Amino acid sequence: MKLQAEKKLIFGYVALCFLMTLGIAFNVLADPVNLNNAPVRSFVQWYSQKSNKAVVVNPDVKGNITVFNADVNQANIDDFFKSVLNANGFVLMAGDPSGVSTPSKLPSQQTDNDDDYEDSADYVPVGDSVPVSAQPQKPLDLTVRNFKLTRVRSSDVLPLAKIFVDSNGGGDVIDYPGNNSLLVSGSAAIMNALADFITSIDVARDQVLIQSLMFETSLVNGVDLSFAAGSASGDKVAGGFNTSALGTALSTAGGSFGIFNGNVLALSIQAVKNDSNSKVISTPRILTQSGQTGYISVGQNVPFVTGKVTGEAANVNNPFQTIERRDVGVSLKVTPVVMGNGQLVLTIDTKADSLTSQMTASDIITNQRHMQTTVQIKDGQTLLLGGLIDSNTTDGNRSVPWFESVPVIGWLFRSHSDSHNERTMFVLLTAHVIKAL
């Protein structure tokens, strides 16, 4: 009996030691998790430390997660980690090391090599990111080719080539302006398609010659240009015009009067020069490519005071003033676009600024006349724009010294005059298409 009691005591002691060892092991392997709106990278770092496994995190993996779990055993830590990632829209991609990414843009090799990745049920679509696969990628059949452009600038073709390459599988396009060419890297299929595309757009553009007459005339008298559209025999025909009637036709600034055929511009220049009530402001000519802006400007670069600091006001020893220079004169900016069937679309921006003789307490005063419009005409036609009225009023006093102050009769030696003059600016513009060789 005594021996049997000793056996029971030994068995109980061994069982107690086993239970204590099991509890210690469970406590060692179990680990509580408490993450409240923590960065997902912190959760990945926790998993890597507990599992002693390396994990690659895609740079696009961002966001926060919340996890409350009483304990996580070492045996099920992988399943727990994967479940938390899937619940928050991420995936664990198998490999050595494994990788955490988003499944929106998985590598194309996934369909052919399903064994290299986790089960497809683990992928939850979310976000816009590029996963980093730990598995070695198959090298692409990349080639580099130089596309020489002969009729257009490479910088103009660069954005079009990039769009074409990106829409056909992707690649790199670099501009080489020194040789007017494009360096492209991509697959052989892209190169063949891009060669045909560049050939179709490497076409010389037409050029447009813009001839213009900017003139001003008296609003009352005007200038007769009716002969400009006359026949070869000198008779006047329909289509001529007289600017004395434009006051009502062009009631708003920048209004369009009409479009004329024939050599209107050359004859109009001579007519304006011969008219005493008219004045030629400028006759600019611009040659530019279709789709490119041509600009010409003639005038003065006038300083304008923009700020002033004096010694008394600012308590400084060196008073100074700031000056900004601005162009004052005549300018013409035209952007022509050659359409089909000899049609032209012109974006016109013209200015005629001038300095006045008046002065204010702060600075000088400038007169500004500005027109901006977009029109469509045919090759060789002449466009008339106008309606910019400049009004000047002049007061004059004249007198004979000493005698003007004589009482009673002093008014006989004094005179006063008022004059009011209104002048209107017109723009005649002719466009000729010069075909590319």
From Swiss-Prot:
An example Gene Ontology CC term for this record: host cell membrane
Superkingdom of the source species: Viruses
Leader sequence residues: 1-30
Subcellular location: Host membrane
Polar residues: bias regions: 99-111
Transmembrane segments: 328-348
Pfam families for this protein: Secretin, Secretin_N, type_II_gspD_N0
Region (Disordered) residue spans: 99-120
Keyword Nuclease found: no
Family the entry assigns: Belongs to the inovirus G4P protein family.
Subunit structure: Homomultimer. The channel is composed of 14 G4P subunits that confer a barrel-like structure. Interacts with G1P; this interaction results in a complex that spans the inner an outer host membranes.
UniProt name for this protein: Virion export protein
Source organism of this protein record: Salmonella phage IKe (Bacteriophage IKe)
Gene this chain is encoded by: IV
